[in-house]
């Protein structure tokens, strides 16, 4: 509620803007008024001779003014004196610090009553001053007992109630004329366009008293009458409510809850200025019983959206009205559209009934459109005599009609009320999920796309079994429908006859008859696989390739700058497609002859195979697998001979002890493709490697060898040392495809030798000495060897080994043998030193890739050695083949 009237200039925060004459006048007037009010209050009430009487007087005065003072009674009697209530007009000055003034201002209160005035009394913890919104109607002066003894004076502050639109306290709002124009001031319509006005003139003119009492304007305290609101409405638009009134609204409520000593109303009994006009003030608080009649009169006044509502509520209300208006118009438009549609439908029905029915005489131009014929004008005419029967009972005409047709407009999609079959999913009109119909794409352009390069003429295997009509159906379902108004309306409007009818999606009788004939023929004679001669297919593919290359050159000449490369690429793709097609035919024939057994467990999946590498599913006759070395060429099929490394596998059908004879066409294509150059890893299949790794691990464990034993044995037998890590990675399929292909024949040879040796020894434990007796004379068995003593290497030998390591970090077995002979050291010691040195280098430089099985020479500058220090001419081997670059297969850590 609007706060206390600052009757003294000393406690006014804006007193620096006032003149000295106004200061003297205001001080004199305040002193005179205060003395008169004190005398009147003392004579009207009891004599304040005791602390109890003073307390009761204070409580009565403040409660009548709208301020609730709760006194607990502890420590009050010692602080109350008679002289503290002598000047009730100084009540505002003594509690001014509670309203935002500085109590320790340079200008003391006028006049100082004592050292401990009301300020000290209100600071006691036992007293709480609470703000209450209390109504005090000015037309009933009997409600205020202290107003009977006060002379009427001019004042704009009548009661403690606040105007509705001003929700923030007065001390949070800047003064009028300081920096901005206050829209809520009474001087807004004075005619002067000045923004910075004299504050003293406003303060003195607001009260309007002849005594020159200085006070703040009405709008400064946030109180407005109906007259001021109406006056502001004339010049202020509806939406120009000052922004600070909205911004400070939440702050005001926060202070209203928290500040218990906030006094937002000035007691009219203490001030002594009754209102000049008896105007009704608006209130935000619920009405009391005494003011019920008056508030009812106030509520009967029609409320407007300028001052009666807040800024946000005004816009919410306006948006709601706009939405209601738009909704009403939309409903009216919908009703009009429905009526217009009904009128159009009736007109079309009358037109179709008036027109003579055209009987089509010839059906030569019926391009397989079931029930639809195009006449010379391009209109589609539907035949009624070949329509399928309805699924539900429909009203039929009483008289018989010859088979006639209905002329459909080209763009019309509305239903008709005459006997018309439900629209079938034919080529002419395709039913879409959203209820619309569309025409399919052009048949001639069905293979063309938006891309500059047309698609390949080679169709994928997944499209081989599709008929032409199925493709047209798919094209019709995927095409986009025109978003016109008639299609939107038709989606929600149906004819009265077709509304409750069951949709007949059965195929037309012509197609049903064809399918029945095909089923009969298929039941009598099973279809034989299409057998094309390879020469005919090759010629057809060549023709397609030539036409395709010409199309590419015409449409996008920059797509293939080199036509020879394009021809080779397309030829390779065509050969692959031909091989896939033949393999698919062979697999289908095999499935018809010998149906696949039902599997209880799913087929094993290869971790090295991606789904894109094998477009055709693989099937096997049984769950048992044999090592790949025992498979014949026929059991592997022709996929390994035809596929490139990009598509290493198309199908594998390992058949145990049987194989279907391949047609001659497959052998011809395979022999033609076998002439191309192929690396060893291209002929090796991923699944074959996987099966061999699994078999090798099982056989090794059964023979009793460790992975390290296999690596050492292969180094002594074949001259290539392998570490335990390399064998482990091979078994776990963690090596690259190239290294796996190169390791496979060596490990396969070792496995065969181990099997033969075990068979010769009668199944005993295999001793590696029987295999390496001709190559080396190692006395101890690998299986029974013990841990060797730690070897100490001399400084000169270590320097030589470091130089050799810089040249090649992974030497071969031959290079290690040469180093051992030159340094008079054991070959195993040198091999272990190189392994340890690689691990050390990996810890020092983690970025170096020392795990690859290919040995690469390290840079001399990376280790800080000058190139001259790495001159190892004495280590160069004879014959020009001497190099410390390791082979592609060496021990990998």
Curated annotation (Swiss-Prot):
Tissue: Initial expression in cellular blastoderm stage, then in ectodermal stripes during germband extension. Broad expression in the neuroectoderm followed by limitation to discrete subsets of CNS cells, and expression in specific PNS neurons and support cells.
Location(s), subcellular: Nucleus
Alphabetical list of SUPFAM superfamilies matching this protein: Homeodomain-like, lambda repressor-like DNA-binding domains
Keywords on record: Activator, Developmental protein, DNA-binding, Homeobox, Nucleus, Transcription, Transcription regulation
Bias-annotated ranges (Polar residues): 623-646
One GO-annotated biological process of the protein: regulation of neural precursor cell proliferation
A GO-annotated cellular component: nucleus
A family per Pfam: Pou
Chain spans, region Disordered: 586-668
GO molecular function terms attached to this record: DNA binding; DNA-binding transcription activator activity, RNA polymerase II-specific; DNA-binding transcription factor activity, RNA polymerase II-specific; RNA polymerase II cis-regulatory region sequence-specific DNA binding
Domain of life per record: Eukaryota
Function: DNA-binding regulatory protein implicated in early development. Involved in neuronal cell fate decision. May act as an octamer-dependent activator of transcription. Could also play an early role in specific ectodermal cells, and a subsequent role in the embryonic nervous system.
Protein name from the UniProt record: POU domain protein 2, isoform B
The gene coding this protein: pdm2
